[in-house]
Amino acid sequence: MSELDPTESLIEYPSDFPIKVMGLAHDQFVPTIIDVVVVHDPEFHEGRIEQRPSSAGNYLSLTVTVRATSREQLDNLYRALSSHPMVKYVL
């Protein structure tokens, strides 16, 4: 049985790739996330976001679908989102 190279990606590039981003429900949350994503996917637009509020309305879950072109691009995007103060979780 062959072993997988940990540096090798299982994703075929380019491809559409969904990322879940969760944070407090705030009127600037969506525009802020768009600004972060556009740095890593310049063709990203608002139409590629699905929004779901929490049952109490305190949190907002976004699914942003980016055009992934490399593992490095996705890693950088995950780091940027995870380190943003408005973001609680990135999946």
Curated annotation (Swiss-Prot):
Provide the coiled-coil residue spans. none
Q: Please give the InterPro entries that the UniProt record associates with this protein.
A: UPF0250_YbeD-like, YbeD-like_sf
> HAMAP family of this UniProt entry?
UPF0250 (MF_00659)
Q: Which family does it belong to?
A: Belongs to the UPF0250 family.
Name the UniProt record assigns to this protein: UPF0250 protein mma_3250
